[in-house]
Regions:
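Extracellular beta-strand-rich solenoid/capping regions of secreted or surface-exposed proteins
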Residues: 2-17, 25-51, 55-76, 95-98, ...
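Short glycine/acidic-rich loop motifs that flank beta-strands on beta-rich extracellular proteins
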Residues: 3-6, 25-37, 58-65, 90-96, ...
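Right-handed parallel beta-helix
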Residues: 13-23, 45-56, 77-90, 105-122, ...
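Residue-level marker of regulatory loop/turn positions in helix-turn-helix DNA-binding domains and
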Residues: 41, 63-65, 73, 104, ...
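Tandem-repeat/low-complexity and Cys-motif detector
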Residues: 71, 102, 215-217, 252-253, ...
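Short, small-residue-enriched loops and turns at beta-alpha junctions
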Residues: 100-103, 156-159, 214-216
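Leucine-rich solenoid repeat scaffolds
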Residues: 280-314
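Ser/Thr/Gly/Pro-rich low-complexity, disordered linker/stalk segments of secreted
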Residues: 311-369
Length: 369
């Protein structure tokens, strides 16, 4: 199905289901600003979107001017997005309400699962503008040009967005990001990042936690944020877009202090930067009181066997209906509100990790696009 404009939907308890990612394909033909994607309106609730493939003709996010997300808007209460494949957009999903009348309608209880979010020019999935109690799980996030998964407790101009709370990223594979981090946490409270495999994020940190962007940041984080039981493999860089080191895990304070964050039981393997945990402020091996580090395994000589992905295709990849996206600019600008190439199939869904040396002493320095 070809679309030459955005599809706008505002409804309650609406189910949109294709015949599967191999059979139902939505192709957005415009390469213009606001030229495509599905936008869910202010009063939507109980949406279910599933079993389809989406792509577009967008080729650039230059000057943050595309405004061309595959899925965006607010999905109200208890919506589900599952078994979809999204690629070649500005962003895979950008969830948040930008109402300027003071009548915010937050996305609450959204579940995204069994999704493939790949080869987009910016974020894979971003929970913004008060999104709460929402989860991304059991999904594959690959080859995106900004944070693979992000929680940004933003307050867009003219809105009164509340702090984000209780969002979760669970048991996902985030890989081959070529800008920013595998997972980014930019404020809010009560979030959980657990069970994720983050690998080959060569231009930034595996996980970054920072106050670079305006918003609620961490001042309201009374319930705590937990980052635990993740594996971060071959990630980090000694030379990001700002000529800075980014470790497997990176902390950066710019607009306030990072508060009440626990980081524990993570495996940080074959990191591409030293130190493995970076920061731009004073923090000891066990943290600084507000950031608490414990039982994290650092091993730069780990033996890795096999390939891992959250989703293993059972058929050949669908032939792209447009040329692979190309990035015309890599200049860093604030996250916009509101790619790569043809996918490669996974060879296996199992991996054996054996550490040849283990240290539980994390060391220590993050941004966006």
């Amino acid at each position: 199905f070809n679309f030459d404009k955005q599809v706008n939907i505002e409804a309650d308890n609406l189910k949109i289901s294709g015949a599967g990612v191999w059979h139902t394909q939505l192709h957005f033909t415009s390469d213009k600003r606001y030229g495509g994607g599905i936008v869910f309106g202010h009063n939507s609730n109980g949406i279910e979107l599933s079993n389809l493939y989406m792509d577009s003709n967008l080729t650039s996010r230059y000057n943050e001017d595309a405004q061309y997300k595959a899925i965006s808007g607010t999905l109200g209460k208890d919506s589900k997005i599952h078994d979809i494949w999204v690629q070649h957009f500005e962003v895979g999903m950008w969830i948040g309400d930008y109402d300027q009348t003071g009548n915010m309608k937050y996305t609450d209880g959204l579940v995204v699962e069994n999704a493939r979010i790949r080869n987009n020019l910016a974020d894979g999935i971003n929970f913004a503008q008060g999104t709460k109690n929402s989860t991304v799980k059991n999904s594959n996030i690959r080859g995106n040009g900004d944070d693979g998964l992000a929680i940004w407790s933003s307050i867009s101009n003219g809105t009164n967005a509340a702090a984000e709370e209780n969002n979760k990223f669970l048991n996902n594979t985030i890989e081959s990001g070529w800008r920013a981090a595998g997972i980014g946490i930019f404020g809010g409270k009560g979030h959980e990042i657990s069970g994720n495999l983050i690998k080959d994020v060569f231009a930034g940190a595996g996980i970054r936690v920072n106050t670079v962007f305006a918003g609620h940041n961490f001042d309201l984080n009374d319930s705590g944020i937990k980052i635990h039981d993740n594996t971060i493999l071959r990630s980090g860089t000694t030379n990001d877009l700002y000529k800075l080191h980014r470790g497997a895990i990176d902390f950066q304070q710019v607009r306030g202090t990072i508060k009440n964050v626990d980081v524990y039981n993570n495996k940080l393997l074959n990191t591409l930067a030293d130190p493995v945990i970076t920061k731009n402020f004073e923090m000891g091996d066990n943290g600084n009181g507000e950031i608490r580090l414990s039982n994290n395994t650092i091993d730069n000589k780990a033996a890795i066997v096999g390939a891992v992905s959250a989703v293993s295709p059972t058929k050949p990849e669908p032939k792209p209906v447009n040329n692979p996206v190309s990035e015309t600019s890599v200049s860093e600008t604030p996250k916009s509100e509101g790619g790569s190439s043809t996918p490669v199939s996974e060879a296996s869904t199992s991996e054996v990790v054996s550490e040849t040396s283990a240290s539980e002493t994390p060391k220590s320095e993050a941004s966006s696009s």
